[in-house]
């Protein structure tokens, strides 16, 4: 049902039939008033018209009608009909509005009966006709007249005495006009045919459109665009469209929970104060470059020195005149860096004398050597200190030098880790510890650069420049050295090798690795070297005399020679001597207990006078362990055999993760070849290599059996050298000692097979060391 477009006239209200129901549903064609659906003759209409003419108003007619009691007379038909029409209105005045109709002027309402009407039949009797719209209970109320009024309605079928009210269906059509002149229509949907609201669903539909139209449908359509369904109770506040607001409406603010990271604050973009954030609109970006010396050169742009002391609460005035300020400065960096400093021999921190001096706070210096945090200092300021926090916090007292100008000056702030500077002295005056005060900085907003350098103990300097944007307050900031320094060693220029003493002990001397004149490098001095696992690499001019002891293995022959195809490098043989000694002396040295030869102390040697059973033969040593009876020709062999019985193994392999122990030194050296893969014994026929000499002897017999030549006519070349006796030259060649089996050494690379006896060849005297050169591409097995 739509709202009435004009008030109901009294003439039209009098034309209604009082006997018909007045609560019928109105549509768009008859929305001006509530129309009765039944009329019963011209007599009733004429009676109602005459009654309306005789009374001044319908309310007076109702009052007069209610006062009459008794059956009506035939002459008063018109008045009784009018009174019958007004009787229900009197009942409705008590509060039952569901049984009445409203009508009248725009500023007042008239009660129209919606109860059963009473008419006369042909016989003259009064007959009540029930109304067809008594169950609808709908009302049409204009909104402009209900601003300050309260309406109480009782639906038909409810009991107003006990307070029980059945479901009431009503319909309100507000008229809202948007900013652009369009009308916003609010439609209500329900389950009934008359377009009322279902209180169970409580759904409100807001339908925008170009004109005001009521969409009265039972259920909302799902395909209607711009239809916003909202369940539950909704309070519609003010809506602002296009930047305009309606009178009497407030702005709607909605809080929507979002899953965002912490420490995020949403600020309206129009209400952001750049000065409160330390960013001034007049600040300029200072760009700079770095020259070849590592200094920062300014391009000449100025930085705004706006004063924000009132907003931030921090004193950043151009001049520092107070002496009791307490402000700690921490400078944050994500990488390892120190502020630029220099250190003299006395350990006092020296500072560059360059300063940025202007009265207006602008930077005019063309050469900024490591100066990007400026602090204007007045004449009264004695000295300041700055606390630089690193991985190991150290309080640094810095030296600030004042320039000759009496005006406010920008001083260079410098710091270094890990040293602590105790002596603080300003230029031209002595400062006591009581005059020290914490540094207070004035930083211009905008972009500036900080150039940091790392000072090494040797005086080398490495530079690092990083950019800081939009920083104004540097309090409670901290430098953190997170990245470790990388030490780079230059190629070796001078090398001093250790010496091998006559006793076989390795005497280490300090090895100095000089870096020369290369920048950004440190000098490293090695004070001690472990003799285990060290390879000597002498250069061309290396002069390192060493006495190398060559041990003779038991199953090998006692003579040394050079192979026929060997070559020698005479530059590598300077001052090198070799001495062939007995294994007993080597055994005594390795054990470290005996310094000279002693007689055998086994029970058989003591009881038998030191000889075996056969007096004419060579001395023999028999094992005294019952059931053994092994015979040895040397006491060292017997002692090694006795260690095998007792389980003593004093010779330990020093190879990484090995640690095997042996009773004999030759067993240990043979075991070492398994780690190094060295095969020292070479076949002269096929150049095949073997680790053990007995394996080589068996292999040579195969060649002798094929050729049918006696073994005494062949020249056997055996290369034997311990791993420590192998020398690797700078050219990549390997020098090994050669074992002479037959003949004598008469020249480099030649073998003389004369009939000289072996005893004349090999003596305990020192002979020049002869080396075999193995090319670098030949594999040493």
Swiss-Prot record:
Changing residue 120 to R: Some loss of sumoylation. Slight increase in transcriptional activity. Large increase in transcriptional activity. There is a cross-link at residue 551 (Glycyl lysine isopeptide (Lys-Gly) (interchain with G-Cter in SUMO1)). Changing residue 551 to R: Great loss of sumoylation, 20-fold increase in transcriptional activity and diffuse nuclear localization. Further small increase in transcriptional activity. Increased interaction with HDAC1 and deacetylation of SP3. Residues 138-237, 350-499 are annotated as: Transactivation domain (Gln-rich). Residues 1-53, 65-88, 301-338 are annotated as: Disordered. The modification N6-acetyllysine is found at residue 551. Ubiquitously expressed. A motif (9aaTAD) lies at residues 461-469. CDD domains: SP3_N (cd22537). The keyword Hydrolase does not apply. Residues 534-620 are annotated as: Repressor domain. A zinc finger (C2H2-type) spans 621-645, 651-675, 681-703. The 9aaTAD motif is a transactivation domain present in a large number of yeast and animal transcription factors. Belongs to the Sp1 C2H2-type zinc-finger protein family. This is Transcription factor Sp3. It comes from Homo sapiens. The lineage of its organism: Eukaryota, Metazoa, Chordata, Craniata, Vertebrata.
């Amino acid at each position: 049902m739509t709202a009435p477009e004009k008030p109901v006239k009294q003439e039209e209200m009098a034309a209604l039939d009082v006997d018909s129901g007045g609560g019928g549903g109105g549509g768009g064609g008859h929305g001006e008033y509530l129309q009765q659906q039944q009329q019963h003759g011209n007599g009733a209409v004429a009676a109602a018209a005459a009654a309306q003419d005789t009374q001044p108003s319908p309310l007076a007619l109702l009052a007069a009608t209610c006062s009459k009691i008794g059956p009506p007379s035939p002459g008063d038909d018109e008045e009784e009909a009018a009174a019958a029409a007004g009787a229900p209105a009197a009942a409705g005045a008590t509060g039952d509005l569901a049984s009445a109709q409203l009508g009248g002027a725009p500023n007042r309402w008239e009660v129209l009966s919606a109860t059963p009407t009473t008419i006369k039949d042909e016989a003259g009797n009064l007959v009540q006709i029930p109304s067809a719209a008594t169950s609808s209970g709908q009302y049409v109320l204009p909104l402009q007249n209900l601003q300050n009024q309260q309406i109480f309605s009782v639906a038909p079928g409810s009991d107003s005495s006990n307070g029980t009210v059945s479901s009431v269906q009503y319909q309100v059509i507000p008229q809202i006009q948007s900013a652009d002149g369009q009308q916003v229509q609010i439609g209500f949907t329900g389950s009934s045919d008359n377009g009322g609201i279902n209180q169970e669903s409580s759904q409100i539909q807001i339908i925008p459109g170009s004109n005001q139209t009521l969409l009265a449908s039972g259920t909302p359509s799902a395909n209607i665009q711009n239809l916003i369904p909202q369940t539950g109770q909704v309070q519609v506040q003010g809506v602002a469209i296009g930047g305009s607001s309606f009178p009497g409406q407030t702005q709607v603010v909605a809080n929507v929970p979002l899953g965002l990271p912490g420490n995020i604050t949403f600020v309206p973009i129009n209400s952001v104060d750049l000065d409160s954030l330390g960013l001034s609109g007049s600040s300029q970006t200072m760009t700079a470059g770095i020259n070849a010396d590592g200094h920062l050169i300014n391009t000449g742009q100025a930085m705004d020195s706006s004063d924000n002391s009132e907003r931030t609460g921090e004193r950043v005035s151009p001049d520092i005149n107070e002496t009791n300020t307490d402000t700690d400065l921490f400078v944050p960096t994500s990488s390892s860096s120190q502020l630029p400093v220099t250190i003299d021999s006395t350990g006092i921190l020296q500072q560059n004398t360059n300063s940025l001096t202007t009265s207006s706070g602008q930077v005019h210096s063309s050469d900024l050597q490591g100066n990007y945090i400026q602090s204007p200092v007045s004449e009264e300021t004695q000295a300041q200190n700055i606390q630089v926090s690193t991985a190991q916090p150290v309080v640094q007292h810095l030296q600030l030098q004042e320039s000759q100008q009496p005006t406010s000056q920008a001083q260079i702030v410098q710091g270094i880790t890990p040293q602590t500077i105790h002596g603080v002295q300003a230029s031209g005056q002595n400062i006591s510890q009581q005059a020290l005060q914490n540094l207070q900085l004035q930083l211009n907003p905008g972009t500036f650069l900080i150039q940091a350098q790392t000072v090494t103990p040797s005086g080398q300097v490495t530079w690092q420049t990083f950019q800081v944007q939009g920083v104004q307050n540097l309090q409670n900031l901290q430098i953190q050295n997170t990245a470790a320094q990388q030490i780079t060693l230059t190629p070796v220029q001078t090398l001093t090798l250790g010496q091998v003493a006559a006793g076989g002990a390795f005497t280490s001397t300090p090895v100095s690795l000089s870096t020369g004149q290369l920048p950004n490098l440190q000098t490293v001095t090695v004070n001690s070297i472990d003799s285990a696992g060290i390879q000597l690499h002498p250069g061309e001019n290396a002069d390192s005399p060493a006495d190398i002891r060559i041990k003779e293995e038991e199953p090998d022959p006692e003579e040394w020679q050079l192979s026929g195809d060997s070559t020698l490098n005479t530059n590598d043989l300077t001052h090198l001597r070799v001495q062939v000694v007995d294994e007993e002396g080597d055994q005594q040295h390795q054990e470290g207990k005996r310094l000279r030869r002693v007689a055998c102390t086994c029970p058989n040697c003591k009881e038998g006078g030191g000889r075996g059973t056969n007096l004419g033969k060579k001395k023999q040593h028999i094992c005294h362990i019952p059931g053994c009876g092994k015979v040895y020709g040397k006491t060292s062999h017997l002692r090694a055999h006795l260690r095998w019985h007792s389980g003593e193994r004093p010779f330990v392999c020093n190879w990484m993760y090995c640690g095997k122990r042996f009773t004999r030194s030759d067993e240990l050296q043979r075991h070492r070849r398994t780690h190094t893969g060295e095969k020292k014994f070479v076949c002269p026929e096929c150049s095949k290599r073997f680790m053990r000499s007995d394996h080589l002897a068996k292999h040579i017999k195969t060649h002798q059996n094929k050729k049918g030549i006696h073994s005494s006519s062949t020249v056997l070349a055996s290369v034997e050298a311990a791993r420590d006796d192998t020398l690797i030259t700078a050219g990549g060649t390997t020098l090994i000692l050669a074992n002479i089996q037959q003949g004598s050494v008469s020249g480099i690379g030649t073998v003389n097979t004369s009939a000289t006896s072996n005893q004349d060849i090999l003596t305990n005297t020192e002979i020049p060391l002869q080396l075999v050169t193995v090319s670098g591409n030949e594999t040493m097995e």
